[in-house]
Amino acid sequence: MRNTHNPNETEASEDAENDTQSESDLSFDHGSSEKLNRASLPKTQNSAIPQSNALNTTPNESTSQIDSSPKIPSAVPHISTPNPSSGASTPNIKRVSDFKFGEILGEGSYSTVLTATENSTKREYAIKVLDKRHIIKEKKEKYVNIEKEALCILSKHPGFIKLFYTFQDAHNLYFVLSLARNGELLDYINKLGRFNEICAQYYAALIVDSIDYMHGRGVIHRDLKPENILLDDNMRTKITDFGSAKILNSSHGSHEEDTHHADKPQAHSRSFVGTARYVSPEVLSDKIAGTASDIWAFGCILFQMLAGKPPFVAGNEYLTFQSILHLSYEIPPDISDVASDLIKKLLVLDPKDRLTVDEIHQHPFFNGIKFDNTLWELPPPRLKPFGHTSVLSLSVPNASNKHENGDLTSPLGVPSMVSASTNAAPSPVGTFNRGTLLPCQSNLEEENKEWSSILQDDEKISKIGTLNVYSMSGINGNDAFRFFSSLFRKRKPRTFILTNFGRYLCVASDGEGRKTVKEEIPIKSVGMRCRMVKNNEHGWVVETPTKSWSFEDPNGPASAWVELLDKASSISLPFGNHSVTSFSRSIARSAV
């Protein structure tokens, strides 16, 4: 698949040209973020990524400026946006209607990633949809710009997901990205159990070459893990998810002086980024997460490819941190001495003593590997499990045990880019932020008992009712409203439960009393909107980018549901999926 821009695209309409900008328009300005509201935003804005200009732009008069422009030295080639004043023709302004959206690949607190096909070219992409409301509410504007800037800086290397277009509408930001069809590296580790050393050597070489390029351009990822390493059509790696990154000398990133040693103490106000099982010991000690932190994570990934699990695994994050800070891990005895030696030299407590990228290149584990342009031309070895000769099919994995090692989203809450959607295993320490739960009604004790089999521990019913519902896929909610009255007779009565955990469930009971969840309405997904239906006090609509639901409560006002649904959509997600809390880190440090 060649994801290149068509230079022969027709010129945009006059209205679209008025919104055209010489650079991208998705940046935020912390000082003016309060001005970013749905009334002040244009209907649609867009730009293709310029070849040599920055991604940020000076918006037109109808839009609040939402960031100062960082200057980015490199960008996606062959995609440019001429300055409208230059007299050059302007490429089509991208809009949601230019793409046909497919399956959801991943969801996070602030974003959803979907497959999409461009209508005019039939090219397939992964489009990340980021909710402006949540980004501003949670003050995550900086991380949007960091991810965008990092993707642009790294666009000329084959080891990274590429950003092709950016555009926005009144509610969402859209990143049009390359689609890595073969999912996450973690899927294959889970399916094989362990890689043999030939496979591990090849994929480790690709990863370390990408790290070398990334660090050479002043980008520190800070959340490297198998979930953030994707595989393209040719089974070569693509690093993704730069929402946690630090870009040196960036107007959006930190201006701290970075060294390979990363041994300077930091203020406690510094936010943690990363995933518990891959976090470096210097981060747990409140020191700078420098380039050596990525080297530590690379050591964890190499260990996991060869051993089948991360080196630091414990029942909860406190014990995981203790294992990291005490360097408590065991290398399986059947791993070769040369591979064991490399792992030991990567997983070193003091970042000053870890191998540098150049030293990794020279390690005997990579004998026969040339770290030059030819590396990415080598055919990937057929995946084989450790100690076996069977070969894994290169079809897209059906990894039902995906994420059994836990996952922590970046400060954006951004999901993995292009992995197949699967169910995460429950965390041993999963809890909710109790202060944000919906209220429970005291008169629903019988209902709580009746439906207890489908409720989670400590989960209670906040509201229950029999609703008339109609759903439709692939239709914009505004268009859907035109059909609601005529389609009302087709709506089906269903029992819906809204829980204090913020889950909106369509439930059913069969003739034998067995309870099942027929569907969970994704009210926490990015771009979700819930609103009343005009001229119908009993009706409301829930809209997501790919599906809309029309509800009617014949026995009560819609406002009672809408108010609770709005509150439920912002309830904190469980942080038990191996995310790092400051409380656990402080205990771990004090115990060393």
From Swiss-Prot:
It is an enzyme of class 2 (transferase). Belongs to the protein kinase superfamily. AGC Ser/Thr protein kinase family. PDPK1 subfamily. The keyword Membrane does not apply. It comes from Schizosaccharomyces pombe (strain 972 / ATCC 24843). This is Serine/threonine-protein kinase ksg1. Residues 461-572 form the PH domain. ATP binds at S109, Y110, S111, K128, S178, L179, A180, E184, E227, D241. Keywords: ATP-binding, Cytoplasm, Kinase, Nucleotide-binding, Phosphoprotein, Serine/threonine-protein kinase, Transferase. The active site is at D223. Involved in the control of sexual development and cell growth under stressed conditions. Phosphorylates AGC kinase gad8 at 'Thr-387', activating gad8 kinase activity and promoting sexual development. Phosphorylates AGC kinase psk1 at 'Ser-248', activating psk1 kinase activity and promoting phosphorylation of ribosomal protein S6. PANTHER family: 3-PHOSPHOINOSITIDE-DEPENDENT PROTEIN KINASE 1-RELATED, SERINE/THREONINE-PROTEIN KINASE.
